[in-house]
């Protein structure tokens, strides 16, 4: 094990295509642009409905052009540019209609407000022959890449158990629009973990789920969620989120854990703890050895979910465009499968549990 190589970074494209931004809100400010700067990607232009914000972002991040209309951006966009769309889910269809056919687009998740809208988005992308991916960037967080590296090398054997547990305090007041979103926690947070589970475990046959409100945020349609994925009688997969643990850092938890026939991996997601300051990530793995007590090994992870994962989601699209990979991992078609699981979780929560007789 001393010579074990654990990959942590996403593979970059050979060619760096210019990027143009549609929408420059908090996620772009805090993650997209820091990631692109770190990778060496160039943002050629941007547009936001808030003109003042757009020009401020252009000045801060040395973007050469801030356009006052989407139409103006489209006309002036280089022919080989990637459209980086970070707008509310309800606005995705309207934006895609205005993007020229046969162009490359990276769309901020979720893929619409619901499964039906997701299907409309996929149909439009196919009609316009867009090379379209969804920014499910958690797949490319350094600790996730490290876990996949170990699993693909067979280090922990066959994975039969995957668990995501989040017990943190999330200041939902930072995103007031979520008060208007049905099943907000599932659609805007647990969707990360649903997509991650699919990426590692494949397609579940069904879902058991319940999302509940919390007395502190009754206006929000769900802030704590339990999801059980049905992968048959041998694999256990679940997601548990409690965003209202307001009792200090001591008992906060935020991790992804994989257990296999030969070992296990546990990755701490420090970003979500003590939010928005965060805590350091941590990565450990254990490999069983005959006749020996289990030993957990610690790996120093370089980089974090925000912003480093956003390098990976953009890189995978660029690599597909340049032809260095044959499959687009987070294509809109694949993302629609994640939306189908999200929809099933919402339906399960609404449908309720099996009633107890007596």
Report the location of each language-model feature:
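Beta-loop-alpha module in the N-terminal Rossmann-like domain of NAD(P)-dependent dehydrogenases
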Residues: 65-124
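N-terminal Rossmann-like dinucleotide-binding module
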Residues: 2-61
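Contiguous beta-strand/loop segments that form the cofactor/metal-binding neighborhood of enzyme cores
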Residues: 2-5, 188, 194-276, 311-325, ...
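Active-site loop of classical SDR/Rossmann-like NAD(P)-dependent oxidoreductases
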Residues: 27, 302-315
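Hydrophobic residues in well-ordered beta-strands that form the structural core
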Residues: 107-108, 132-134, 163, 239, ...
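C-terminal helix-rich "cap/oligomerization" subdomain common to oxidoreductases
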Residues: 1-15, 81-85, 316-358
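Predominantly a Rossmann-like dinucleotide-binding segment in NAD(P)-dependent oxidoreductases
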Residues: 138-219, 225-226, 352
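Rossmann-fold dehydrogenase core element
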Residues: 120-138, 157-164
């Amino acid at each position: 094990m001393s010579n074990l190589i654990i990959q942590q970074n996403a593979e970059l494209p050979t060619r760096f295509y210019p990027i143009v931004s549609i929408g420059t809100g908090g996620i772009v400010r805090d993650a997209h642009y820091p990631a692109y700067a770190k990778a060496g990607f160039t943002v050629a232009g941007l547009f936001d409905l808030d003109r003042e914000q757009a020009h401020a972002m252009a000045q801060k991040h040395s973007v050469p052009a801030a356009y006052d209309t989407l139409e103006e951006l489209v006309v002036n966009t280089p022919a080989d540019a990637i459209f980086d769309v970070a707008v509310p889910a309800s606005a995705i269809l309207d934006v895609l209609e205005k993007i020229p056919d046969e162009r490359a687009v990276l769309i901020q998740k979720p893929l619409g407000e619901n499964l039906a809208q997701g299907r409309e988005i996929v149909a439009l992308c196919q009609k316009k022959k867009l090379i379209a991916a969804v920014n499910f960037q958690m797949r490319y967080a350094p600790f996730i890449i490290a876990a996949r590296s170990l699993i693909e090398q067979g280090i922990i054997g066959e994975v039969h158990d995957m668990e995501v547990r989040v017990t943190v305090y999330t200041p939902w007041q930072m995103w007031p629009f979520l008060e208007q979103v049905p099943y907000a926690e599932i659609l805007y947070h647990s969707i990360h973990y649903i997509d991650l589970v699919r990426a590692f475990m494949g397609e579940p046959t069904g879902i058991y789920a319940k999302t509940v409100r919390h007395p502190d945020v009754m206006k929000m349609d769900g802030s704590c969620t339990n999801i059980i994925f049905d992968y048959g009688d041998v694999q256990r997969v679940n997601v548990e989120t409690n965003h209202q643990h307001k009792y200090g850092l001591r008992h906060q938890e935020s991790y992804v854990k994989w257990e296999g026939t030969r070992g296990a991996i546990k990755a701490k997601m420090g970003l979500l703890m003590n939010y928005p300051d965060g805590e350091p990530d941590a990565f450990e793995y254990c490999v069983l050895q005959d006749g020996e007590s289990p030993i957990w090994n610690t790996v120093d992870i370089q980089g974090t979910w925000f912003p480093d994962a956003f390098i990976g989601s953009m890189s995978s699209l660029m690599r597909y465009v340049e032809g260095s990979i044959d499959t687009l991992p987070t294509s809109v078609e694949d993302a629609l499968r994640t939306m189908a699981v999200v929809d099933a979780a919402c339906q399960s929560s609404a449908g309720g549990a099996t009633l107890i007789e007596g």
